[in-house]
Amino acid sequence: MELAHSFNLKDPQFLLNPYPVLSELRAHGRPMWHEEMQLWLAATHADATAVLRSKSLGRIYTPQEPSDLWETFNWLHADSIMENEGAKHTRLRALVSKAFNRGQIDRLAPRIQKIVDELLDNCEELGEFDLLADFAEPLPVRVIAELLGVSPSDEVNLRPWSQAIVKMYEFDVSVEEEVAARDASSEFAAMITTMVES
């Protein structure tokens, strides 16, 4: 089918309104190979669920090259829960889940409520606000900052760093985006190192 070859994920028209193409992909009824992107497109809920649950599919991190340029970025990703499968994934998930057990969440609840209240107060002061940009996006960032013990002065950097780093999961990443990802990785790692050493 030509559809799998007829769109570009970076095409401004596709980004503006991806829904007609996605609808056609779903109507096709099965995963399709996209030659340019070198990947399978699973557009239906059933296909996506099958892919995510398949034990024969997974992700093992492949370091960015050249390694001297990407050293910090690669270091941050090599032991990421999202980049590993099997026993290593299970071990990492067990470590992370300790931060989200019932007791931890109960202890954090008052602080989370305070963050929610602050964000809602800010939205009220704005009068007109963007629910995503002014509430839904900053909320998890501020909660994660609270979990990690990140200072308010560093907290404002978490989202831009994250956005720059995850850009590397997209297709056709520009040289500027690569530089931004490396810089964000270095700045984030430096912040964590400072926190651990203090």
List each model region and its residues:
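Active-site substrate-recognition loop segments, prototypically the cytochrome P450 B′-helix/B-C loop
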Residues: 1-132, 141-159, 163-174, 178-185, ...
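Generic, well-ordered alpha-helical scaffold segments in large soluble proteins
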Residues: 191-198
